[in-house]
Amino acid sequence: MINFESQHFQKLAFKEKQIDQFLMSAQHDLEIAESTDISDVVFKFSYDALIKLGIMLIARKGYKVRSKSGHHVKILEKLSQLLKDEDILVLGNKMRQERNVNLYDGGFFLGEKDSLEYLEFVKSAFKKAGI
């Protein structure tokens, strides 16, 4: 059984419509990542889709992540546990760190090869989730 720590997660009964909206948002971001050849856009929307997938799966379990420092790490940890795949935490955290460098430290340029590998990784997470 997965433990949703109260300092990071709040128990919340989501309506099915809300969970469907989370899923549609995650799928929309994945579609954007798949439809462009701009590496930075592929990466950003792949990462966002992965986080939103985690938010949706956590919501299905009746929890909402608390919005505070480190909450993306907690989403990735739970996503990894829910899908029983340690690589999701490892690669997801690598994506998070690269995103943070890009966002907070003046940026970086991710090559096409790396961005497409991340996209394939995120697509595999969706498959593992049955989506």
Residue ranges with predicted function:
Residues 1-131:
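Terminal alpha-helical segments
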